[in-house]
């Protein structure tokens, strides 16, 4: 599944931050853009695995692609 990723630089954290708005609380960071996106893929997998274990629904991706 392909979820929307919001990626931005955080001056406070001095890192790139990735938010996955379709998966509540799903965030990752990294010292580079590429590392942040790779970390987000791991966190998305873990988020979905935890949701399955708890019997919670996993939202379908909205399918919107946008550049900001």
Predicted regions and their residues:
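A short, exposed loop/beta-hairpin motif centered on an aromatic-Gly-Thr core
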Residues: 24-35
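Short, charged, surface-exposed hinge/linker loops at domain edges
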Residues: 1-6, 13, 38-68
């Amino acid at each position: 599944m392909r979820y929307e990723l919001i990626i931005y630089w955080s001056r406070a954290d001095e890192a790139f931050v990735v938010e996955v708005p379709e998966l509540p609380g799903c965030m990752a960071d990294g010292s580079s853009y590429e590392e942040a996106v790779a970390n987000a893929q791991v966190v998305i997998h873990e988020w979905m695995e935890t949701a399955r274990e708890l019997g919670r629904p996993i939202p379908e991706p909205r399918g919107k692609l946008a550049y900001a």
